[in-house]
Amino acid sequence: MLSLVGRVASASASGALRGLSPSAALPQAQLLLRAAPAGVHPARDYAAQASAAPKAGTATGRIVAVIGAVVDVQFDEGLPPILNALEVQGRDSRLVLEVAQHLGESTVRTIAMDGTEGLVRGQKVLDSGAPIKIPVGPETLGRIMNVIGEPIDERGPIKTKQFAPIHAEAPEFIEMSVEQEILVTGIKVVDLLAPYAKGGKIGLFGGAGVGKTVLIMELINNVAKAHGGYSVFAGVGERTREGNDLYHEMIESGVINLKDATSKVALVYGQMNEPPGARARVALTGLTVAEYFRDQEGQDVLLFIDNIFRFTQAGSEVSALLGRIPSAVGYQPTLATDMGTMQERITTTKKGSITSVQAIYVPADDLTDPAPATTFAHLDATTVLSRAIAELGIYPAVDPLDSTSRIMDPNIVGNEHYDVARGVQKILQDYKSLQDIIAILGMDELSEEDKLTVSRARKIQRFLSQPFQVAEVFTGHMGKLVPLKETIKGFQQILAGEYDHLPEQAFYMVGPIEEAVAKADKLAEEHGS
């Protein structure tokens, strides 16, 4: 049976080879060479290729197949390069397709940036001659746009003359800046144990419902107001309701001003209901807006991405639609490349900086999953949100032992900050080690020294909680922003034993240490009466 299959295969192969005589093969090879756009190099430098390609923008093709979000388009001449944007003609709403693959000599396989309902074979498609271009500049502040730069806030067109392609090269090594400076957020647990670097990349890791989006909203509230620069928020594959809530909260807090041009933030949304093409590109759209402020205006920009996992997830969907063989856990084989291409553009140059805060959903709370694990390599600081801490009612539910920062170094943060942070982590680690003994034998079996460790650790654990301004309506506590000096002083005094006499509940949901003392006095009065 096998030999028969082999004979048939070899016969068909030789038949195919006989059919393709040298004289027939030569013009075909020449045709393929002619079809390649000018300035294209063999390297997979698609962004540069798309930008360097001739900007004719007049090639017209026709749709030959529609398979969900994948559309095949045939061009009789002028095959568009990879990553070029194509526009479908004869539709009420604008539909942009991005070239993903070349199938043979005259057909391209594209990914749609919007729904493909109503598309029919034979419809005309126009090559724009460039990658997707979006509006950039101060006019984008206070506005919401989608992946292709269309305003979706019902406030008319974005009046700007400046447009930029969403695919670009990362800055050269020579342009990068190496200065290190702490970015104070006003959140105690973050500033003390895993401080953020100005111009760095920060990851917020956590499973479903542990508070990633609330923490991002608080950071926008604290840092955008205190830092005074521009912010860009990219909503990637998250809930539309949260995007809407965020927009209205920004209007109420004055970060977005509808009356004049004093808005501080630009919003770019590609939410859960969007096709995978839009979700895979919307992070790049947000990044392009931020790059303009960094490179052209010399600003220190804050870029918030919620959620970077959805970027990977959308890339995985696109990869499957294009028929690529999946890699580990079903992710796309180009996972590290896709992530690296985007993350390398988020950097600090000599002109300005982009500090990015990225919420990272951790599937099934598994930090070894390829999506969060690939993201780890790019980050300067990681803030890990823990379900176990959230279950204790301690918010923000930041894990003080798992969260890390590259700048937690005495040469950068200073000896006092470093010593207090390490002291806090040591006492919390000791408490964690004693928990098994407490569970089996109870507190009474501990030595006096261990009892003191447990008492201080529980106070520190509660003092790491903090009421947020954006969560006032849920908690009933007024939001607090704590300066770094106050944070260090408070934890230093708890470690020194100055507040051993206060009850641990006095340290829960307060700002600086003075509030804990006042709360303890209030509790004593209530208890006394």
Swiss-Prot record:
Positions annotated with a glycan in the UniProt record: S106
Pfam families per UniProt: ATP-synt_ab, ATP-synt_ab_N, ATP-synt_VA_C
Signal peptide span: none
InterPro entries per the UniProt record, alphabetical: AAA+_ATPase, ATP-synt_VA_C, ATP_synth_F1_bsu, ATPase_a/bsu_AS, ATPase_alpha/beta_chains, ATPase_F1/V1/A1_a/bsu_N, ATPase_F1/V1/A1_a/bsu_N_sf, ATPase_F1/V1/A1_a/bsu_nucl-bd
Disulfide bonds: none
Top class in the EC scheme: translocase
This protein's record includes keyword ATP-binding: yes
Transmembrane regions listed in the UniProt entry: none
Chief place of localization: mitochondrion
GO molecular function: angiostatin binding; ATP binding; ATP hydrolysis activity; MHC class I protein binding; proton-transporting ATP synthase activity, rotational mechanism; proton-transporting ATPase activity, rotational mechanism
Gene Ontology terms describing biological process: angiogenesis; cellular response to interleukin-7; lipid metabolic process; negative regulation of cell adhesion involved in substrate-bound cell migration; positive regulation of blood vessel endothelial cell migration; proton motive force-driven ATP synthesis; proton motive force-driven mitochondrial ATP synthesis; regulation of intracellular pH
Residues annotated to bind Mg(2+) 1: T213
Transit peptide endpoints, chain numbering: 1-46
Post-translational modification N6-succinyllysine, affected residues: K124, K133, K161, K259, K264, K522
Binding site for Mg(2+) 2: E238
Transport among keywords: yes
Binding-site residues, phosphate: G209, V210, G211, K212, T213
Residue positions binding ATP: G209, G211, K212, T213, V214, R239
Modified residues (N6-acetyllysine): K124, K133, K161, K198, K259, K264, K426, K480, K485, K522
Catalytic activity: ATP + H2O + 4 H(+)(in) = ADP + phosphate + 5 H(+)(out)
PTM description: Acetylation of Lys-133 is observed in liver mitochondria from fasted mice but not from fed mice.
Key words of the record: Acetylation, ATP synthesis, ATP-binding, CF(1), Glycoprotein, Hydrogen ion transport, Ion transport, Magnesium, Membrane, Metal-binding, Mitochondrion, Mitochondrion inner membrane, Nucleotide-binding, Phosphoprotein, Transit peptide, Translocase, Transport
Its membrane topology: Peripheral membrane protein
Subunit structure: Homotrimer. Component of the ATP synthase complex composed at least of ATP5F1A/subunit alpha, ATP5F1B/subunit beta, ATP5MC1/subunit c (homooctomer), MT-ATP6/subunit a, MT-ATP8/subunit 8, ATP5ME/subunit e, ATP5MF/subunit f, ATP5MG/subunit g, ATP5MK/subunit k, ATP5MJ/subunit j, ATP5F1C/subunit gamma, ATP5F1D/subunit delta, ATP5F1E/subunit epsilon, ATP5PF/subunit F6, ATP5PB/subunit b, ATP5PD/subunit d, ATP5PO/subunit OSCP.
Protein name: ATP synthase F(1) complex catalytic subunit beta, mitochondrial
